[in-house]
């Protein structure tokens, strides 16, 4: 199970309970959380580095090579952390109002995260790229280079998705 939003350190007890029972993946976007996990984890977890692919709300800027390298270096020395890869969420796709606009956001987001895999795949050959948001997963068919997609509420849809252009009204599954 991947908790696909930044790790909340106030949930460390729950994290430790879950990690002792399942294969748990967390998201990290800063050194403070990583250092906290280093001191408080009691069981192994996978860690995705949360990458900002353009929404500018959460995640490490995909161009911040120094911070990315610092986080990777720190992770490599933590016994209970297994670096899984890079994870992105194109939250800015929700501001789109056409399929073409969603596709443009998706392609740009995909490009940013794939550049990281290209840079780090020799050092981390099993690196996973995880990318997803409901609008992009609804509209785009091009996920080449992405290992895992996270379609959000794709199976239900709603009026917001209809306004964005992700679906037709008759595809809304929840009233």
Model-derived regions, located:
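Active-site anion/phosphate-binding pocket segments in diverse small-molecule metabolic enzymes
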Residues: 100, 104-175
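Active-site-proximal beta-alpha core segment in soluble small-molecule metabolic enzymes
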Residues: 1-96
């Amino acid at each position: 199970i991947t908790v696909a939003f930044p790790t909340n350190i106030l949930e460390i007890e729950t994290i430790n309970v879950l990690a002792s029972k399942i294969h748990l993946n967390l998201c990290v976007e800063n050194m403070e959380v990583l250092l906290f996990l280093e001191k408080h984890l009691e069981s192994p977890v996978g860690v995705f580095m949360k990458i900002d692919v353009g929404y500018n709300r959460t995640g490490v800027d995909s161009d911040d090579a120094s911070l990315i390298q610092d986080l990777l270096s720190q992770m490599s020395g933590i016994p209970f952390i297994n670096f899984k890869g890079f994870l992105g969420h194109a939250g800015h796709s929700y501001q789109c109002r056409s399929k073409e606009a969603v596709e443009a956001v998706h392609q740009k987001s995909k490009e940013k995260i794939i550049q990281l895999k290209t840079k780090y795949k020799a050092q981390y050959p099993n690196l996973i790229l995880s990318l997803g948001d409901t609008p992009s997963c609804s509209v785009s068919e091009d996920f080449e280079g992405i290992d895992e997609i996270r379609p959000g509420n794709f199976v239900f849809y709603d009026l917001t998705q209809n306004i964005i252009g992700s679906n037709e009204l008759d595809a809304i599954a929840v009233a």
